[in-house]
């Protein structure tokens, strides 16, 4: 994980639960403590989880570290008349350039997770078969951005869109606009810190911000020594 330019090996907590008849006995808290102890013993200094109850995990020492922004845009609001010098090509999900692009993005983006093979397998595990990946290339054939999307019931669902520079950002929006005869609406996720409304001529769109991941330091001395 990139934490302000430093690469950290982090642990994950997932599927923490107890049977209803055993709730209120502190079992989950003990499981959590045991998990964090094992992470610390394996030389990890930071841990992440996706909370189902923010107040609960706050009481256990976790705090929100990132937000997830979602947006809904009408087809008439998609930026148009862009003429970036590069081009977009669709690729398979296991394309090496696609995955390498995410690694380059992670290296320059605070809070971004590096993905290994297992992470990529999990990334696409629940996606529908016609989910597509499109890469933006410069005029010199250098990949600088991508988007993962699905078109269903006249709606383009953008699972992820990242770009390394302004040209790739505009080039991908140009690609989205090229689907104007096929879609009535665009729904997407935005992991950047800036709302996208400022990018549109018609900024009257729906954007929502929700807490995404929670984290906590599990080895203060090791964390600071790596920082």
Cite the ranges covered by each PLM segment.
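Conserved active-site alpha-helix within GNAT-family acetyltransferase domains
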Residues: 41-45, 51-69, 171, 193-209
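Intrinsically disordered, low-complexity, positively biased terminal segments
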Residues: 85-227
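Conserved catalytic-core segments centered on acid/base and nucleophilic motifs
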Residues: 47-48, 57, 161, 176
């Amino acid at each position: 994980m990139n934490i302000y330019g430093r690469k950290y090996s982090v642990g994950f907590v997932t599927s923490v639960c107890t049977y209803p008849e055993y709730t209120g006995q502190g079992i989950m808290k003990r499981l959590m403590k045991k998990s964090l102890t094992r992470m610390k013993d394996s030389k990890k200094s930071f841990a992440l989880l996706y909370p189902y109850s923010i107040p609960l995990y706050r009481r256990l020492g976790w705090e929100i570290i990132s937000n997830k922004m979602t947006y809904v845009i009408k087809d008439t609001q998609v930026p148009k008349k862009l003429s970036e010098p590069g081009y977009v090509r669709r690729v398979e999900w296991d394309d090496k350039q696609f995955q390498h692009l995410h690694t380059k993005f992670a290296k320059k983006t605070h809070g971004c997770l590096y993905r290994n093979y297992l992470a990529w397998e999990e990334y696409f595990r629940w996606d529908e078969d016609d989910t597509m990946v499109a890469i933006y290339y410069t005029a010199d054939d250098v990949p600088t951005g991508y988007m993962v999307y699905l078109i269903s019931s006249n709606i383009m669902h953008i699972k992820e869109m990242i770009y390394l520079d302004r040209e790739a950002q505009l080039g991908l929006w140009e690609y989205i606009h090229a689907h104007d005869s096929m879609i009535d609406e665009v729904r997407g996720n935005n992991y950047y810190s800036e709302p996208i409304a400022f990018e549109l001529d018609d900024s009257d769109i729906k954007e929502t911000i929700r807490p995404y991941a929670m984290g906590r330091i599990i080895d203060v001395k090791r964390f600071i020594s790596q920082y």
